[in-house]
Amino acid sequence: MAFCNLISRGWNQFFFRGFSGESLGLLRMYIGCGLLFFHTYQFATVLTLNPIGSRNYFLDPIWYFHLLGIQYHIPALSFIVYALLMTATVGMIMGKWTRTSILIVILCIFYLKGVRDSFSGDVHHRYIIPMQMLFLFLLSRCGEVHSRDSRRDTYPPLQEWEASWPIKMMQLYVALFYFWSVIAKVRVSGWEWFSGEGRIQEVLIKRSVRWGMTGEGELVKNSLSFELAQRPDLIQIFSHLVLAFELGFPLILFIKSVKLRAFFLSGVIIFHISSFILMDVNFLLIPFVYLIFFDLVPIHQWLKIHAWRLFKRRPSMAG
């Protein structure tokens, strides 16, 4: 019985403590701001198409397009859906019809992601984390704080447990996302992935030669990747660092120090930047989701004070 009580207290302490309703509302706003940039970056290729161009059949439609019978692309529709996506994201930020806005964002992402993946013939996974977060926002009462909805209607105050569980679930999902990526690597390639002359070296070479070579025999792009591929000793060191941080990522859930958390996540950001430069793994903007690991109330207050001071300044008239 004592052991069960201990487990129960630990469960409650982890999932239902630590955040206020204000924290949840601010997280919705800041994540929404990050999504504005993320959407544009992810769907830039779709937006380069001629909006009044001809319809094109998908050679390999994504599974849910196939299920719904969507067989071809209407260029103008993608632009309409993108405009709706950005409008709904702004609605999410402002807290205007919050749940409806979040639901529209999710549906628009499904459509535009389906278009992009059906063209490329490959399923991209960069929206996995943001989509899980949007789903948890949808289930939560995040639209009742720091929102237009809260000015229109009167809501009862959010209890600590109501504000904490969505954020803690987001944290847990992100931590396990990195942890399970190690399991996925080992399942696909075995421990060879983390050897100096294994899978990483192969990917580096492929990424460096994918753009071809000049007439002089020089690589058109990513020559740094090719140079690194010739150094299996360095690859071994980097691969072990990646192994350590991915296996150890769940430990961030128990780190109380804000500075230590920020230091760890800074290293993860450097990892994503390096992966983008060397291996063209395009998770470059995903670090905006790391805001879930911080209480944004003091950060927001600090920004309000300093931003207000900045806008209060006026250029002096010379002469």
Regions found by a protein language model. Name each.
Residues 1-319:
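Alpha-helical membrane-anchoring segments
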